[in-house]
Amino acid sequence: MTNLAPIILFVYNRPKHTETVLNALKKNTLAKDSILYVFSDAAKKEKDFENVNQVRDIINKISGFKEVVVTQAETNLGCANSVISGITKVINKHGKAIIVEDDILTAPNFLEFMNEVLNKYEKDEYIFSISGYNVPMQVPESWKSPVFLTYRYSSWGWGTWKDRWNEADWDVLGWQEIFTDKTKNKLFRRGGDDLPYIFRAQMNGTMNSWAIRWYYNNYSKNRFTVFPTYSLVENIGFDGSGIHCGKAGKAPNKPVITQNGEKIDLPDALEFDEEMNKLFISRYKYTFKDKLRRFLKELLRYKINK
């Protein structure tokens, strides 16, 4: 395969996770032909110094890729700023990118899938990004495509193109309308009932997320993300070690799919399928109790951070 997208890996203070993620990436069939960019954020607190240095020891000895470019921040940028600036730098040079963070375990055919889809649908402007992750769901026997469209985004092993990325408004102007206009709130929730709560936390300053702002841009332009029918990644960060992922026994995860060598038969044109979308979004539907619990959680977080 030619015209491969570069891989971007963001790391911070988790040496064991970083090593595990790199080992999985190296087992990808296209790793040896791919350029890997690694962005290492500097320690925010003194207690993080040792782990950050251990991570940097690991990333400065990486092999198994066509080329490795390591960037080590001298001061702490924070997760959101690190990701936004890193992707912008690489994607403006290469035109597209595949992005992985230090808790995303990839299947051996992850890079093959991502490159195939990025190349296939680059000209389809209604597609905003590509995901390598999918939730556990009972796929109908009638569904034969390896991919489907949904309104939700994913930051668990994903890719996009320069033109889509550079359209993003990171200041999310007009965001208040999500909470004052019922129609817009309903449209925003097409990606999941959890998203308005995450978005409110971001805009209240109790969360610092690039991903929810990326979704806002996806929503505002009425675009889709391409998801694989079966997941090609597993998030190993639900152990309390991450910035945004705490401990969770019911993380929407799925074991990594390891089959390899099968040709990915992508349709020439993608159409939104309501049934597949309903199956997918059902993982993010809230009951009244869920909504009340989430509201109280965000209220408590807001009071603590005031």
Model-derived regions: residue spans:
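An acidic/histidine-cluster motif and surrounding catalytic segment
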Residues: M1-I99, I104-K306
